Amino acid sequence: MALPPGPKQSSAYQTLAWTLRAPPFLESSRREFGDVFTVNLGIVEPVVVVSDPDLVKKVFTGDANILRAGAGNKVLRPILGGRSILLLDGPEHLRERKLMLPQFHGERMEAFTQLMRDITNRAIDGWQVGAEIKLQSAFQEITLDIILRALFGLDEESRRTTELREALHRMTRWASGPLSQITMSREANNKPGLWWMVKPSIDATDRLIYAHIAERRNAKDLALRDDILSLLLQAEDENGKGLSDRELRDELMTLLIAGHETTTTAMAWAYERLLRQPEDMQRLQAEARGEDRDEGWTDAVIHEAMRRRPPIPMVARSLSEPWTLREEDGPLPAGTIVAPSIWLIHHREDIYPEPEAFRPERWLGVKPDTYRWLPFGGGIRRCVGASFALLEMREVLRTVAARTELVLADPSSSRERISRRAIVLVPRHGTRAILKSRQPAAQSEPAAVAA
């Protein structure tokens, strides 16, 4: 069984290129080899990268017992744990998904809206007029507070909240290092590496999460609480079985890490462009302040930011048996990783003319296509928290736009380069801005979002 052709450089070179400069590496490979090519990242199985939407549809709608996303995500196991919804396959994954999905839809989301606004307003109140703000860091503080409150219902001034926030910050700082992804891959494949550098932070986070679980299981008011942990503790499958402490720990860690890092990054990339395109910023502010009729500009900004700079460059499926992607290639061997590339699909010129241009108007009156806009993955593996993330981005961006006037810290910079934080593509300098002015929250409550 032959693999599609791909770069001929050594696996060490390809691994380094993927780690340090993933988008250029993917783009140059597509230019040379087309929409399907094989890369060798050394410490994982061969990776067949796919950037044709029709083939991506075939991957996302294929037999999940053959195209195993959990096995394809094993690089995440050292942090998220083996019972994370991202690491499970087959019936175990479907069971977990059914238990978790209801917590992130419908009336549950409406209940989080005011929480998101309140936390964002408190953060803005702490920003100093005339001072430089790294918006990546500022948004991270906001999204971390939101997810902590949503998951645990914690008082933001409590000792346990502070400890959990500090432990997560230590993990994030480690993930900012250039070797974090390689370290995670080596640990996931049981190879020696530098895992000892981050393990104490993970252990500290685990102790706090397990303490929350134990405390909440015994809470007399459990049935009255509306935080996600309490709701998950009460959730049962069709056999009347709930989630174990280990399952809860892994799902909570997944929501903590995935629930704020990618959202933070998408908003930082949105502002990286908005600060350089004043007309687009003014339109967002006018909509947020209720000065213009809501035509969906905020959502268009979010869709375009996540298209142009998707936080995750590709997703993965591991083949449990030989499987045919393209007839001309024949079946791919079992163990091969098939990887739809979000980055490459989002930068196809035949789908998105001038793909590097930031043009939110692409999305006005347009619903994103399932296989051409996929920052949340697709198929039965689409992110369970996608609705939460989109609501959070909408509320945070509108609140910030309604209350603040921000300008670039370095007006001479035309764009910000990409850096890597574990598996996430972030603005290299954190989207540096100066706060020129700030309106009081009472005078600038963001306009209601159209349903």
Task: Please describe what each predicted stretch is.
Residues 1-95, 110, 114-122, 204, ...:
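N-terminal membrane-proximal hinge/A-helix region immediately C-terminal to the signal-anchor transmembrane segment
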Residues 220-226, 283-296, 308-329, 345, ...:
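Cytochrome P450 fold signature focused on the C-terminal beta-domain
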Residues 262-281, 285-287, 387-404:
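Cytochrome P450 catalytic-core helices
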